[in-house]
Structures are given as structure tokens and as C-alpha cells.
């Protein structure tokens, strides 16, 4: 079974130098930017709406990414939109949400329908960001339900850049190419 599968007339679209582990599943209306990495056990399902993942983002082991359909309660449904240089930690659930550039979603976190994580947003491990919530720029949210804990330091913001760059180098090792970084 191939990890990349069409759904109806939609086939996942892949940018350059993308790494997709053979033990994951990517279905339907999914677009991966250049240098994206998708690690073992991840499921990205773009069946009833679309998923977009920006350049240099990494989706770590066991993550589930899905979308919501249009309904009488939500006319358009919600896609899942992930910006550039985003780190999605192991075992995360992203459902019909928006993650802007240079964010980190901690291991085991859950971000639900219509929620938005602004640039440099950091969702701590195990946190649950409820439907429609907005994590502001450079904010750390923790807990279940997730709440604002504090603003990130400059050093923590630097670590978000580092995390994305590290995963580009790592996926290049898996692909057997030089990243030039």
C-alpha cells in the first residue's frame, strides 16, 4: 500500500525535496510545500476539505491531521492550514485549524476546529486548544483547556527557527542529500 493515495479526483501534491516516511498515510486534497517532512505513523486526510503544509514544516511521528466538511452548522467547513517552518510534535492532533508560520505544537497537543495559532505561537505538550480559540503571536499556551501562560522570550523564538531548520537537515539525511545548511 502506497502512503500517498487519491480520494475521488484529488491526489496529494508534493513540493521539491519532500520526505514522506513509508509508514504514514496522505490522502486526497493535500499540498506539501518544499522541504516538508512527514514522519512515521502520521495520517494526513484531506477528504472533505483541503490540507496545506508550508515549506520546511515538519509533522512528527503519529500525528493526525484532518479537516471538517461543510454543513448546516458551518457552511464552508474548515481546511487545515499549516504555515512555513512549523514544528508539529509527536502524537499531535490538528483538526480543521490554522497554524501560522514558525509555530511549535508540542507533543500530544490537540488543536480543534476553527482555532488559529498565530506566528511564533507555542502550544505546550498535551495542551488542548478548543474550537475557535486564537493563540496570539509569540504566546505560550498550556493545559486542558489551553490557556495563555506567558509570552515567549527572544531565545524561545530563536528555538522555533532552530527546530524547523533541524528537521530540514534531518529529512535531507533520510533522503541522502545535502541541505546546504
What are these regions (language model features)?
Residues 21, 46-47:
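Thr-Gly-centered strand-to-loop micro-motif
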Residues 1-13, 41, 47-80, 90-91, ...:
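Glycine-rich hexapeptide-repeat left-handed beta-helix
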Residues 2-38:
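N-terminal segments that cap or nucleate solenoid repeat domains
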